[in-house]
């Protein structure tokens, strides 16, 4: 059986009008303009893939900052309410878990769940940890650092998530 292999510089006559990037979509995050106009990318090359950097930054990547005075985690959880989130400190780790049951949105029914685990620096004061959810869905987990030589206190406990009415001051990537 002979299989015809098409050179990348030659395209089908209607090739630009067929969506060929089905697996580039971030399911549950909606569509961008270039998802609706697939012929723009295939006119360059049939092997061209849209950059996903913008989509990845908007899809829940966290940012961890650890400076001299404090430790902060920023996490985009815009699809979750404070009741859907659980934040626990287990020895040297903070575990953030989010889950919401199936609900209807513009495209059908969807359920989401994530689990993130971060190592806390040894000099973070675990008795002063706080967690808040901004109006735009940015979860901020923070704790002050203590001078070296002072016991930071390690224990297992749940951190309540408080709701803020203002948007986050986290950097937009």
Swiss-Prot record:
Modified residues (N-acetylmethionine): 1
Main location, first listed in the record: cytoplasm
Organism classification: Eukaryota, Metazoa, Chordata, Craniata, Vertebrata
The protein's role, per its UniProt record: Contributes to the transparency and refractive index of the lens. Acts as a chaperone, preventing aggregation of various proteins under a wide range of stress conditions. Required for the correct formation of lens intermediate filaments as part of a complex composed of BFSP1, BFSP2 and CRYAA.
Residues carrying covalently attached carbohydrate according to the record: 162
Modified-residue entries (Deamidated asparagine), positions: 101, 123
Amino-acid positions noted as binding Zn(2+) 1 in the UniProt annotation, renumbered to this chain: 100, 102
One of the GO BP terms on file: protein refolding
InterPro entries in UniProt: A-crystallin/Hsp20_dom, Alpha-crystallin/HSP_16, Alpha-crystallin/sHSP_animal, Alpha-crystallin_N, HSP20-like_chaperone
Gene: CRYAA
Amino acids binding Zn(2+) 3: 154
The protein's name in its UniProt record: Alpha-crystallin A chain
Binding site for Zn(2+) 2: 107
Family per record: Belongs to the small heat shock protein (HSP20) family.
């Amino acid at each position: 059986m002979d299989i015809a292999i098409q050179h990348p510089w030659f395209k089908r006559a209607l090739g630009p009008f067929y969506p060929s990037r089905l697996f580039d979509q971030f399911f549950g995050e909606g569509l961008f303009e270039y998802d609706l106009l697939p012929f723009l990318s295939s006119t360059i090359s049939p092997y061209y893939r849209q950059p996903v950097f913008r989509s990845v930054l908007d899809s829940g990547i966290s940012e961890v900052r650890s400076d001299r005075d404090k430790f902060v985690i920023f996490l985009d959880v815009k699809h979750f309410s404070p009741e859907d989130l659980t934040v626990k400190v287990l020895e040297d780790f903070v575990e953030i878990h989010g889950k919401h049951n199936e609900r209807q949105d513009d495209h059908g029914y969807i359920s989401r769940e994530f689990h993130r685990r971060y190592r806390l620096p040894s000099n973070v004061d675990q008795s002063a940890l706080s967690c808040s959810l901004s109006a735009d869905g940015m979860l901020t987990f923070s704790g002050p650092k203590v001078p070296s030589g002072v016991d930071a206190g390690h224990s297992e406990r749940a951190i309540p998530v408080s709701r803020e009415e203002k948007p986050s001051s986290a950097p937009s990537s």
